[in-house]
């Protein structure tokens, strides 16, 4: 897909790895969706997704509620988009409030569904836990989650030869909880 004469990969039902998306020439754009909590809202959102499909975004990302509060809803929306549209869904996956085995289980479910990419994030604690103790999470930071996804890929657990494409996000101005930007880079 990279190296084609299109500004971004053609959106098809064939796998599109996030690296291919960002290695293409020209502009790229995406849409981000938050999974609704009711069936009626889900159908309304999916109708909108089908209408936006004709815009041919490079990918669509699906958020993951604070502390994984929308874990199942996110998974269901990602799989529905994957199976019924030509769009490339990229689910957010956060490490807050998750054990290592939970993360492994989530990755396995996405791999088995044919999902090619993950957006690895630290995430926010649930609203009712503003003082959440991150030391109790299996991965305190997204960098550790990225390592776990790479280990998952290296174990050959994903059916695709490349495994998951991994996207990350950052704070250009520095993470609010980091008192020293130089230390943050380490």
Each PLM stretch: what is its role?
Residues 10-19, 42-51, 55, 68-87:
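Glycine-rich, positively charged N-terminal anion/phosphate-binding segment
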């Amino acid at each position: 897909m990279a190296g084609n004469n299109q500004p971004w990969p053609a959106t098809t039902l064939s796998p599109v790895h996030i690296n291919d998306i960002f290695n293409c020439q020209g502009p790229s754009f995406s849409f981000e969706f938050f999974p609704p909590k009711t069936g009626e809202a889900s159908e309304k959102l999916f109708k909108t997704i089908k209408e936006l499909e004709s815009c041919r975004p490079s990918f669509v990302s699906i958020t993951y509620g604070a502390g994984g509060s929308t874990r199942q809803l996110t998974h269901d929306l990602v799989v529905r988009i994957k199976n019924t549209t030509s769009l490339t869904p990229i689910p957010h996956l956060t490490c807050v409030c998750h054990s290592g085995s939970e993360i492994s289980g989530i990755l396995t479910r996405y791999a088995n569904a044919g999902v090619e990419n993950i957006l690895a994030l630290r995430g926010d604690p649930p609203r009712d836990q503003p003082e959440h103790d991150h030391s109790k999470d299996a991965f305190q930071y997204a960098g550790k989650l990225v390592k776990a996804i790479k280990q998952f890929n290296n174990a050959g657990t994903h059916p695709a030869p490349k495994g998951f494409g991994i996207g990350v996000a950052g704070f250009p101005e520095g993470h609010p909880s980091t008192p020293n930007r130089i230390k943050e880079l380490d």
